[in-house]
């Protein structure tokens, strides 16, 4: 569980994105360049799951969060990314979370990125030499039941919000949902990597102010009330099951959380 805690670094990471614009872009971007469609075009093209020649997997999500699965290092990383343009080049800045969940400039990398629409590739170039550094192609599931990457990616495409925190008992609690709350995901994982998950349809009871999530596999349901606190955190009251206090996190946290639990934990429901 300690390793999981280290990489639970998506909390409020979206606030970092605005400060990640490269210096050269911040200084040289003109009003015309700011209106250029390159950034928007690249941003839309790169959403999804990609794989490079080394087998590393890159997941880019709509809230500017990032989830990397490094094959050689046998580890997963969370981070945030930002795109900017000087009118000629589009820069991709990727900032990875440190082991303690913090962010700093030392754990950051910048590429020039180009979407090769004809071949459906993402090309990453060195910003100084302009040499091609990596070519990313869309990830394709291999059909193996143990390959959950496409399932996680599909979930990431649906979700639009994520909240993460802890229960009263100190368990990690992750709640995510789509725009209208009709698809939700809840993951609760304890210090021994035992976990309970609910992934499926969500319904909101306006009269009682409760959310009910019915797992599409087990058909078990979880109901909790939602209270907004003064510090912008949420308290989720599950009745006899206790409560959890959560705050806004990135979509990558929801995706990685479920992946971690399935691959490393023991399912309890």
Question: Which residues does each PLM region occupy?
Answer:
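Short, exposed beta-strand-loop hairpins at the edges of beta-sheets
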Residues: 121-132, 234-242
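Sec-dependent signal peptide cleavage junction
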Residues: 18-37
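An anionic, turn-rich surface loop/hairpin at beta-sheet edges
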Residues: 90-113, 209-228
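C-terminal partner/receptor-binding element of secreted or periplasmic proteins
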Residues: 132-149, 243-268
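Tryptophan-anchored aromatic micro-motifs
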Residues: 32-56, 147-173, 258-269
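N-terminal secretory signal peptides that target proteins for export/translocation
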Residues: 1-3
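N-terminal glycine/threonine-rich, aromatic-flanked beta-hairpin/loop signature
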Residues: 52-101, 168-210
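Sec-dependent N-terminal signal peptides
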Residues: 5-15
């Amino acid at each position: 569980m300690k390793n999981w805690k280290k990489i639970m670094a998506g909390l409020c990471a979206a606030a970092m994105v605005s400060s990640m614009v490269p210096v050269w872009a911040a200084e040289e971007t003109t009003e015309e360049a700011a209106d250029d469609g390159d950034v928007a075009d690249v941003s839309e093209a790169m959403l999804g799951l990609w794989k490079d020649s080394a087998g590393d997997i890159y997941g880019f999500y709509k809230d500017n969060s990032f989830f990397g699965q490094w094959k050689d290092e046998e580890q997963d990383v969370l981070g945030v990314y930002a795109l900017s343009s000087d009118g000629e080049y589009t820069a991709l800045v990727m900032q990875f979370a440190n082991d303690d969940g913090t962010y700093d400039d030392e754990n950051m990398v910048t590429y020039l990125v180009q979407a090769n629409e004809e071949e459906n590739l993402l090309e990453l170039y060195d910003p100084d030499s302009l040499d091609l550094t990596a070519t990313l192609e869309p990830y394709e599931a291999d059909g193996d039941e143990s390959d959950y990457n496409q399932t996680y990616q599909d979930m990431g495409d649906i979700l639009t919000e994520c909240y993460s925190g802890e229960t009263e008992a100190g368990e990690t609690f992750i709640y995510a949902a789509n725009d209208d709350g009709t698809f939700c995901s809840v993951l609760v994982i304890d210090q021994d990597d035992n976990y309970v998950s609910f992934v499926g349809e969500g319904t909101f009871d306006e009269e009682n102010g409760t959310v009910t999530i019915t797992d599409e596999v087990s058909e078990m349901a979880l109901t909790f009330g939602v209270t907004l606190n003064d510090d912008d955190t949420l308290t989720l009251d599950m009745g006899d099951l206790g409560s959890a206090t959560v705050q806004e996190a990135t979509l990558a946290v929801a995706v990685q959380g479920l992946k971690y639990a399935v691959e490393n934990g023991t399912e309890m429901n």
